[in-house]
Amino acid sequence: MELIQDISRPPLEYVKGVPLIKYFAEALGPLQSFQARPDDLLISTYPKSGTTWVSQILDMIYQGGDLEKCHRAPIFMRVPFLEFKVPGIPSGMETLKNTPAPRLLKTHLPLALLPQTLLDQKVKVVYVARNAKDVAVSYYHFYHMAKVYPHPGTWESFLEKFMAGEVSYGSWYQHVQEWWELSRTHPVLYLFYEDMKENPKREIQKILEFVGRSLPEETVDLMVEHTSFKEMKKNPMTNYTTVRREFMDHSISPFMRKGMAGDWKTTFTVAQNERFDADYAKKMAGCSLSFRSEL
């Protein structure tokens, strides 16, 4: 029980103006010694935007579609999470030491906190963006079950914090826009969660082309099936059920909850939706990004 008391619900800490989980903020110092390699591939997302999904797709690509190899370890061991650090579990940097090249890496960090070495080495990036309303709802449920986060409070208060960028990793609006801008000068494949839901095979083909690999069509079809939400939700190597309960309590909300586009409509009130839309229009003014909030 002592460990639970030790880790449970610490307040966010600000680093360069960005709020972060306390333990992740502590990882940023050691992360400065990280050395990227030109053959690394970085998976970047704002939280709750399809990170685990695209991680599993890329690991399958790197393993040539071999399902057995993809069952070698949980996804967070196969794709090291750069800024990850909580008591009693190997940190992202520690996991990285045992990861053979070519490495898949994961981050949610905004550019202000990203290790410069990743940009200097021109590391390829697969970025996935998801519509803000579904992210907010999914993040709210995740805050409830992941005990390294502060308690989210009511949905209404959490939504206000989300809109103000006062949740872990800060502003969704800034995150999606700055990585979009980076794609003009850096090798970034910018994908949309909704496109992946609509036509996963098409999006997997884009990823294959981006990483310079090819697989037989029947292998790609197998990947589409194996990386479907239904399959990943029941796969202990992707659904985070191997994580100890004092960190993630799946009885509160499963890590893989619904995996759909448009679920926000079951949560937002009409008034919240109108307020959100007005605020969204201001924050995204002048940005060429376009999101679909349902399919």
Curated annotation (Swiss-Prot):
Subcellular location, record wording: Cytoplasm
Matches recorded under Pfam families: Sulfotransfer_1 (PF00685)
Active site per UniProt: 108 (proton acceptor)
Binding site for 3'-phosphoadenylyl sulfate: 48-53, 130, 138, 193, 227-232, 255-259
Top-level class of the enzyme under EC nomenclature: transferase
Catalytic activity: a phenol + 3'-phosphoadenylyl sulfate = an aryl sulfate + adenosine 3',5'-bisphosphate + H(+)
Binding site for substrate: 106-108
Gene Ontology BP annotations: 3'-phosphoadenosine 5'-phosphosulfate metabolic process; amine biosynthetic process; catecholamine metabolic process; ethanol catabolic process; phenol-containing compound metabolic process; steroid metabolic process; sulfation; xenobiotic metabolic process
GO cellular component: cytoplasm; cytosol
E.C. no: 2.8.2.1
Keyword match NADP: no
The organism's place on the tree of life at top rank: Eukaryota
Key word Transferase present: yes
Record keywords, A-Z: Catecholamine metabolism, Cytoplasm, Lipid metabolism, Steroid metabolism, Transferase
Single GO MF annotation: flavonol 3-sulfotransferase activity
Function statement: Sulfotransferase that utilizes 3'-phospho-5'-adenylyl sulfate (PAPS) as sulfonate donor to catalyze the sulfate conjugation of catecholamines, phenolic drugs and neurotransmitters. Is also responsible for the sulfonation and activation of minoxidil. Mediates the metabolic activation of carcinogenic N-hydroxyarylamines to DNA binding products and could so participate as modulating factor of cancer risk.
Family to which the UniProt record says this protein belongs: Belongs to the sulfotransferase 1 family.
Quaternary structure (record): Homodimer.
Protein name as annotated: Sulfotransferase 1A2
Organism: Homo sapiens
Gene that produces this protein: SULT1A2
